[in-house]
Amino acid sequence: QDQKLIIKVFNNTNKPKIINNVHWININQINHSDKPHYLIAMSDANLFKKLSCKNNFLWSHSIQSVEKFIRKKQLLPFIKYKPIMILEGDYPYKSRNFFTSFYGKKILKIAVDDDFLNFNIDLNNIPKPNAIFTTKSDRNIKFLLDSWHEIKKKSLNAKLFINPPFNLSEKNIKDDINLRKKGDKNLLIQDLIKSRLFITPGHKTEVFCLAAEEAKELCLPIVTMGYGCLYERVNHGVTGFIAKNMREFIDYSLSILNDDNLYLELKKNLIKIKNLRNYENVKNDLINILDIKND
């Protein structure tokens, strides 16, 4: 007999609420008599202690070594509750240590918000030669700034916008490196569509890089070294470029900043793949991973 699917999320919400048929409950108000069919813990295997469930899944947002897993006191609950790992892409899947994914692992690619998916892109608009970096400022920022110093020499009108907090040096300011104003999602969208290039080396700790996916959804070409998951965000030569070294990183960036035709070609390719994945797709993929019968 079919039963209605009930979804409960336990977090730090101040008061219980129901949004789109999802129950939001403070984690300290868990009813321990609840017997869920499926239990998903976010990043911490110790959370499985809070409820009894036979079908456990551990959703990880990081690359964890065995040493870190032990240090965070996750090994014993991991062995006890036997969760299947949920990982957000090819890079974390391949990088996950066998001993921290012993009970299986599945890939669940996430998506960007509808505001990015539904934003209308003007194919013929050519922005000023602005580059933007909207991920955390500690992720290979020295590589980026050293590269930008060389880029600036051959693209005199180019500007680079990075996320705060970061202390700009006099050299950075001379290189037209600017701090973005942190604001809401609409401000981020405006900053991205006013840019011609999303530039990021990537970092070994990045397992999805939502910032790059948001830029791609707004049809912004990407230049990256492909570190971490960044190689998954770019189709080389079609939606951007994956450099093998700093020289290529600089040259690829210059080619997009200085060549209107190349920029428009990449943008045209990006528009073809716009709005291909949304949270309806994520939901369906999660249902398949959990093996829920959704008749």
Can you name each region flagged by the protein language model?
Residues N11-K82, Y91:
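Extended catalytic core of nucleotide-activated donor transferases of GT-like folds
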Residues E67-F69, Y81-K105, L117:
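A short, active-site helix/loop in glycosyltransferases that binds the activated sugar's phosphate group
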Residues Y227-G237, F241-I242:
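Short acidic/histidine- and often glycine-rich active-site loop of Leloir-type glycosyltransferases
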Residues K244, N261-D291:
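A charged, aromatic-enriched C-terminal amphipathic alpha-helix characteristic of glycosyltransferases
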Residues I193-V207, L220:
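Acidic donor-binding loop of glycosyltransferase active sites
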Residues D114, L123-K185:
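Conserved catalytic-core segment of nucleotide-activated headgroup transferases in glycan assembly
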Residues I189, A212-E217, Y231-E232:
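Short alpha-helical segment that forms part of, or immediately flanks, the ligand-binding pocket
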Residues Y91-P92, I107-N118, F166-L168:
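Short beta-strand->alpha-helix junction loop in the catalytic core
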